[in-house]
């Protein structure tokens, strides 16, 4: 059964509202890290500043730090050298050691866009494959909320981008220690 998104209440300037019939396939990526689920989750969230490349942001210049606030409604944001902050999205589900869901509040033009009705969504699951081995499954979905052209464009970009980000994450997760 296909999940459909309601079209935005009003279409953004220069962009058509997404018809209910549009469906854009989600991006699914996974990686196995040699650490337990609690540590894997902590590195992905509290430790994001250590693995998210500081040159991969949408703000004014390089990222000074990346933060995911640890609660539903918390922000995922970057702070830049000039002190400005750019919101990447908001936490929708926070289940430590198991699952994280965040809105991806970035337009296809790689600008912040706080309109929730246009946001895609990133879900990350942490699945134990042993006491010190975790499979991390990432699904980036709901691109159709952006409209056909913008949604397909964003999907193409993140389909190519998430593998490298997960490799950066895996390197950090593999480091010794049990907390970020």
Spans of features found by a protein language model:
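Hydrophobic/aromatic beta-strand elements that line small-molecule binding cavities or substrate pockets
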Residues: 29-31, 88-93, 119-128
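A conserved amphipathic terminal alpha-helix motif
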Residues: 2-9, 141-180
């Amino acid at each position: 059964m296909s999940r459909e998104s309601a079209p935005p209440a009003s279409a953004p300037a220069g962009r058509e509202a997404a018809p209910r019939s549009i469906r854009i396939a989600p991006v699914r990526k996974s990686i196995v890290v040699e650490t337990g689920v609690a540590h894997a989750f902590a590195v992905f969230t509290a430790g994001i500043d250590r693995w998210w490349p500081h040159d991969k942001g949408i703000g004014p210049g390089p990222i000074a730090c990346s933060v995911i606030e640890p609660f539903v409604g918390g922000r995922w944001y970057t702070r830049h050298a000039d002190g400005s902050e750019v919101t990447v999205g908001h936490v929708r589900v926070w289940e430590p050691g198991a699952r994280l869901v965040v809105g991806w509040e970035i337009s296809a033009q790689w600008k912040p866009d706080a309109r929730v009705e246009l946001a895609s969504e990133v879900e990350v699951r942490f699945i134990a494959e042993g006491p010190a081995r975790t499979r991390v499954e990432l699904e980036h979905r709901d691109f159709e909320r952006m409209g056909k052209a913008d949604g397909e464009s964003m999907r193409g970009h993140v389909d190519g981008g998430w593998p490298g980000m997960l490799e950066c994450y895996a390197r950090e997760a593999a480091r010794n220690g049990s907390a970020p």
